[in-house]
Amino acid sequence: MSDHFQLKSHFKPAGDQPTAIAQLCEGLEAGLAHQTLLGATGTGKTFTMANIINDLNRPTIIMAHNKTLAAQLYGEMKEFFPKNAVEYFVSYYDYYQPEAYVVSSDTFIEKDASINEHIEQMRLSATKALLERRDTIIVASVSAIYGLGDPKSYMKMMLLLKVGEKVDQRDMLRRLAEIQYTRNDVDFSRGTYRVRGEVVDIFPAESSTFAIRVEMFDDEIERLSIFDPLTGAIEKHIVRTTIYPKTHYVTPREKILGAIEKIQEELKDRRAQLLSANKLVEEQRVTQRTQYDIEMMRELGYCSGIENYSRYLSGRTPGDPPPTLLDYLPDDALMIIDESHVTVSQIGAMYKGDRSRKENLVEYGFRMPSAMDNRPLRFEEFEAISPQTIYVSATPGDFELDRCVGAIAEQVIRPTGLLDPLIEVRPVGDQVDDLLSEIYKSVEKGERVLVTTLTKRMSEDLTDYLSEHNVKVRYLHSDIDTVERVEIIRDLRAGVFDVLVGINLLREGLDMPEVALVAILDADKEGFLRSARSIIQTVGRAARHLEGRAILYGDRITKSMAKAMDETARRREIQHAYNIEHGIEPHSLAKKILDSMDVGEEAGPKDNLRLIRKESKKVLSAKEITVQIKQLDSKMHAYASDLEFEKAASVRDEIHELQQQLIN
């Protein structure tokens, strides 16, 4: 373990990178709160980020706008910093249905969730690293702005063990129960402990590879060891250790009792309000639900939906921001917001969506008004609590440009000498046939192709058409989960197929050096998917290939197209001049095809639709088919009740296939 970052790379900063690194580091040292790294696609923005982290030597959080990009960044940062703590913090839900009330049909939907235990372990590992180490990098999604347990309560509940310390074994086991560890002498797994005479084995909640053995003699800790929970082999003896709570939401007993008093006071006031408004059903509902929760908290220390009482458990006043991952960051931390033109707006949107759902729950007596404070941060709260920030994007948004006037580091030169892709405009009339001929040419040269369309229907039809013409093609759509999306991108790079079709899923941050051609169909249809920013991002997917080019199909050149083409031409001019001046011969980027998403593979959801589909393709017995049909039937109804009708229809088709197998 080191207090200093140790960057490992075969490359040195090149092109614009040294200038950008120096400018941003100087700005941070000078105390600038906001800076922007405007880096063209393929210029090595991630490597620049890694060098800034290494030179600055401060704990860092990198925020991405989705799990796919976060997984890619996590994999790259782990490569750059193998000896430091690189952690991953995203939502641990494989499936999440928040509680909601549909007024029109008088339907209450209970909270339902499937938690990915591997991701939960990585979240706990992330906060542990922040509390214990300076050399920590957290790669996070917008999950970082959602309520998390209060860090003060969390730290207060930690169990410290030292060799030679006097401790009663029963007291130690009681403390383990308080931090929600469960005793299991048979199945020793994460978040459990087992007792064998005077030996207590503890499997830390934040660990996947090691456990702690506490050996006692009478009432004294005689030895502490780290061992492999699978083989039982002792790895090393230690002098002290800290056992962290099993969940971030653990709360000391006295705080729970104090919170119960305040909850009862609020319940009394709320009942009076509802009765005075003659809302008898709502009054009965909120009384029954809240009193049940109070009894659970009093007896067990927690209840289902305890996060709805987080205002009282963390000692906040009404309207105060909830504690989040950002509260675990030290004061001198650094924040990097990747693909900021998307991530910033996403952070701002989280609060509004959450609030509208909660208002119904409160109004109709399913929750008390204090539940409104269990929420993500508002954007202004996020800004207030954020440390010094660097926004990273090839196309920064207006927000970043306004905040960073005079503090923008431009990175246009690629270390590989590659120029921005050539852009060509062709008519829409025969776009599909023209595209097919271009695909044939590219595939013959061993290149990959990305095609982006405007609608899901067109993507599906185009995929079918290309497939009928012997093109190895896949369609990337919104129903595909995070893990499978990464697999599809990896398969494209590996040459399992040659063409990937999508709508707006092919833009930010996807790193595919094998892609030489990007085709944008109906590029002259102005709108969000065909804005200048979107076109620049999409065209940028071909910027890592020597033969990189883009075809925009349109019967006219819109303002957005013109702006994107002008910016690309400007960059090409700068890049070409630099290459001539320094005698650089452009070459394609060679990058290993890594499985950066091993963060999600280990504990993928067993009921994942993708896995069920794979299973359904196998030859199954009649009994197995019947069991699968039952599983899929319940899943179909669940999707339908969540108004996810496309997924429900997809599951229905799977059921029909299985029923056909059963008949045959």
UniProtKB/Swiss-Prot annotation:
Any matching Pfam family: ResIII
SUPFAM superfamilies associated with the record: C-terminal UvrC-binding domain of UvrB, P-loop containing nucleoside triphosphate hydrolases
Cell compartments where the protein resides: Cytoplasm
Source organism superkingdom: Bacteria
List of residues binding ATP: 39-46
Domain called Helicase C-terminal: residue spans: 431-597
Cross-referenced PROSITE patterns: HELICASE_ATP_BIND_1 (PS51192), HELICASE_CTER (PS51194), UVR (PS50151)
Motif (Beta-hairpin): 92-115
GO BP, sorted A to Z: nucleotide-excision repair; SOS response
The keyword Cytoplasm appears for this protein: yes
Keyword Nucleotide-binding assigned: yes
A cellular-component GO term for this protein: cytoplasm
Gene3D superfamilies according to UniProt: P-loop containing nucleotide triphosphate hydrolases, UVR domain
Gene Ontology MF annotations: ATP binding; ATP hydrolysis activity; DNA binding; excinuclease ABC activity
InterPro entries reported for this sequence: Helicase/UvrB_N, Helicase_ATP-bd, Helicase_C-like, P-loop_NTPase, UVR_dom, UVR_dom_sf, UvrB, UvrB_inter
Residues making up the signal peptide according to the UniProt record: none
Similarity comment: family membership: Belongs to the UvrB family.
Subunit structure: Forms a heterotetramer with UvrA during the search for lesions. Interacts with UvrC in an incision complex.
Domain note: The beta-hairpin motif is involved in DNA binding.
PANTHER family found in the cross-reference section: UVRABC SYSTEM PROTEIN B
Protein's UniProt name: UvrABC system protein B
